[in-house]
Amino acid sequence: MLYVRDVFPAARIVCYCEFYFNRDGQDYGFDPEFAPTQGDGFHVRTENMVQAISLLACDSGTSPTRWQQSSYPDVFKSKIVTVHDGIDTTSIKPDRTARISLRAKNLTLSASDEVITFSSRNLEPYRGFHVFMRALPELLQRRPHAHVLIIGGDGVSYGRLLKERTYREHLMAEVGNRLDDSRVHFLGLLPHRDYLRVLQVSTAHVYLTYPFVLSWSMLEAMAAGCVVIGSSTAPVREVIDDHRNGLLVDFFDQRQLIETVDRVCSNRDQYEAIRANARSTVVERYDLESICLPKQLEIIQVRTPQATQSVRAAPDALDH
C-alpha cells in the first residue's frame, strides 16, 4: 500500500483491517504455556508497520467484527467500518442426509452417528488444538461410540513453530497412547464440499481460539446448523450468546469442555433450537449476498472528492 496513492491518485482506497496487534487484552501473552519472549514483543510492533502506513493513506477500511475493529488505535477507528467478509449460507446449510466416507478405515458416518468435530486451517495452540487434544482421552472414555473428525494442516498459521516436530506430533506424543485411533480421525485439509459434509454430520463442534481473528470456520459451522462449543473469548462472545445459539466454555478449562461436549452428545434433541438459532444468526448478520456484499459495495462506491484532491497534491510535495 505504500505507493498506491501515488500510482492511483484518483482511486478510492479501502484497506482490509483484519487485526491490529497489541500487548494487552489480545493474543499476546494470553496462553501461559507459550509465554512470549522479548522478540515476540518486537514482533507485535513490526506486524503493525505496514497497516499503520496503509491506514494513513486510505480513504476507508473494513474490519470483519466489532472486536477486531476495536483492536485499532483510536486515531484510525473513525475510518474503519465493521463488515464481515460474508458467509455463503445458500451453499453452507444443514443437510441431515449428508455422509462422510473415510475409505482408509472403511467407515461412513452420518448425522445419526455420534460425531465430534474440530476444524482449523492448521492444528495449533492459537486455535486451542492443545486443549482439545488433552480433553480427548476422557471424552472418548465417556463417549464409547463417538468418532472424532479433526480437520487441519500441520503447519503454523499464527504463533511460534516448535523445533523439529509439529503440534500434532507433539500432542500425539503426549496423549496418543490414550486415544483409540479407530475413532480419532485426522483428515488434513479437505476440499470444501467434504469439509461441509463433516460439519453437516457433526453432533458437537468444538471451536477454541485465543483473543484473535475470528475464524470463518466457526460461522460456517453455525450456518451448517452445528452445535458449536466455543471458547468464551472476546471474538467468540461477539457472535455466540451462551445457550441460545451456541455454548461457551473457558478456553483453558478441559473439564468444562469435556462435560459440555458429553452433555450435547447425551441429549441431542435438547439442542435442536440452538442449531436453528446458530444458522439464523449467520443468515441475519453474516450472509454474503444479502448482508455483507451490499455493505462492502457501498463502502467501495462512496466518493470522497476532497480527500482525493488533497492527496493528489502529495506527489508534488515530494518533488521539492
Task: Map each language-model feature to its residues.
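C-terminal alpha-helical cap of glycosyltransferases
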Residues: 288-320
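A short, well-ordered alpha-helix in the C-terminal region of glycosyltransferases
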Residues: 256, 263, 270-285, 291, ...
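Acceptor-binding helix/loop patch of EC 2.4 sugar-transfer enzymes
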Residues: 11-49, 90-99, 111, 153-165, ...
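Conserved acidic donor-binding segment of nucleotide-sugar-dependent glycosyltransferases
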Residues: 242-243, 247-254, 263-268
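Nucleotide-activated donor-binding/catalytic signature segment of Leloir-type glycosyltransferases, i.e.
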Residues: 156, 162-189, 193
